[in-house]
């Protein structure tokens, strides 16, 4: 399979099984992050593995950040339990006169999406999650982020269910997205 084939067949899997890659299995995917285009090689990112109780603590941070109570708090708290492994993607701003913050954040975003593609290609179910609580103070605190760090979101990773629906995407009208300046 070519890289193009892998990208074209990639789809999010919002329902995954309890299987998840081990830390050892993740290491090559983390190493591959060094290949993302990165002006000045700043590596303005880091990844955080969340398993087990860390997911429960994230759920509590979601509930706190949302201000929800009762069933709504339970619902917010259950969101991180949809996969056995969550990989938090963190933008780490590095002081640089050559590379502005927006460009560094773009590198961290590239790391996130490259991880998603690699995990999908390896046969794992992956979906990307963000939302209004992503950069809230309780969620920031739960991830033990430094002042120069911002959370971008999470890759939820698990096994693929036996019956996985094929994503029937509409074909892209490429002419709308690729224009030419003359």
Question: What are these model-predicted stretches?
Answer:
Residues 52-57, 64, 93-95, 137, ...:
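Short, charged/polar surface micro-motifs in flexible loops or helix N-caps
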Residues 1-83, 180-182:
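N-terminal amphipathic, basic helical "cap/leader" segment at the start of enzyme domains
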Residues 138-152:
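Short, electropositive alpha-helical surface patch
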Residues 84-87, 153:
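Structural motif
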Residues 3-13, 17, 151-182:
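C-terminal helix-cap and adjacent tail motif
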Residues 33, 87, 93-142:
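Small-aliphatic-rich amphipathic alpha-helix that forms the alpha element of a beta-alpha
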């Amino acid at each position: 399979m070519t890289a193009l084939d892998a990208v074209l067949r990639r789809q999010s899997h919002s329902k995954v099984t309890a299987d998840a890659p081990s830390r050892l299995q993740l290491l090559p995917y983390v190493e591959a992050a060094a290949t993302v285009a990165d002006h000045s090689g700043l590596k303005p990112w880091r990844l955080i593995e969340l398993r087990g109780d860390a997911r429960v603590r994230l759920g509590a941070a979601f509930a706190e950040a949302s201000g929800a109570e009762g069933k709504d708090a339970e619902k917010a708290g259950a969101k991180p339990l949809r996969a056995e492994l969550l990989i938090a993607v963190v933008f780490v701003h590095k002081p640089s006169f050559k590379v502005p913050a927006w460009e560094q954040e773009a590198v961290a975003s590239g790391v996130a999406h490259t991880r998603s593609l690699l995990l999908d290609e390896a046969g794992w179910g992956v979906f990307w999650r963000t939302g209004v609580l992503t950069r809230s103070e309780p969620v920031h605190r739960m991830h033990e982020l430094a002042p120069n760090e911002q959370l971008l979101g999470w890759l939820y990773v698990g096994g693929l269910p036996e019956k996985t629906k094929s994503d029937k995407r509409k074909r892209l009208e490429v002419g709308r997205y690729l224009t030419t300046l003359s």
